[in-house]
Curated annotation (Swiss-Prot):
Bridged cysteine pairs (disulfide): none
Alphabetized PANTHER family for the sequence: LARGE RIBOSOMAL SUBUNIT PROTEIN UL18, RIBOSOMAL PROTEIN L5-RELATED
Protein's name in the database: Large ribosomal subunit protein uL18
GN (gene name): rpl-5
Keywords noted in UniProt: Cytoplasm, Nucleus, Ribonucleoprotein, Ribosomal protein, RNA-binding, rRNA-binding
Amino acid sequence: MGLVKVIKNKAYFKRYQVKLKRRREGKTDYYARKRLTVQDKNKYNTPKYRLIVRLTNKDIVAQLAYSKIEGDVVVASAYAHELPRYGLKAGLTNYAAAYATGLLLARRHLKAIGLDSTYKGHEELTGEDYNVEEEGDRAPFKAVLDIGLARTTTGSKIFAVMKGVADGGINVPHSESRFFGFDQESKDYNAEAHRDRILGKHVADYMSLLKEEDEDRYKRQFSKFLSNGMNADNLVATYQKAHANIRADPSPSAKKAAKPSKRHTAKRLTYDERKQRVADKKALLLQLKEQQQE
């Protein structure tokens, strides 16, 4: 069959159907979303939960959500900007912070649904691959990873968040092939290297190296770390302490009372107020007129 030229006449435009808004904006992959959200037909009123991970320039977002016709419902969320509460006051977008954010999300949600004591997760960090096993009467909470439009690169921070969630006690179907430390050629997984990455040892090593080579650049580049008492010697211990603090109290901080917004426009008066305002103006004008006549 030869080339068929599309004739863009009135009938073409009349029948033309635009794609969905978020597809036109390049924000949602609906091919993937359909497979992440559609539940089996023999399961009724059982939502399929998604572990949503998004990376920004200044933050790491981790959420547990399920979809409804009206839109997605977020049941739990954790952010890297919450980590200063647990002792991590700098480096909130690195690999170690991504793991801590995932751990915070898992422990927070399990505490909310009353499974934190049953499924404690992998309490001793070894870097080994960990999958939750069913214990007691209630099955572990299950969620599938949703990475949006990000690339599934081996060693990505997205999988650090997933590792934190899995170690926190939530069942996330995965394999070790995308973790840091996995060799694509030999198919071997170096758990020790992954553990060092999670505890920020690579950052500590670079801090030591940079301090020896160029101290001025070291002070400039790691100024936030140094001002908060984080250096190459105590960095690994700081991350370990943060993990312990997260497990001790994963609950979100209390919201501050919202301040009343400043009003930049005049408040609308009621009918009685407008009537009284006119009467006051009339009285003032009459008073001024009497003063002039005197």
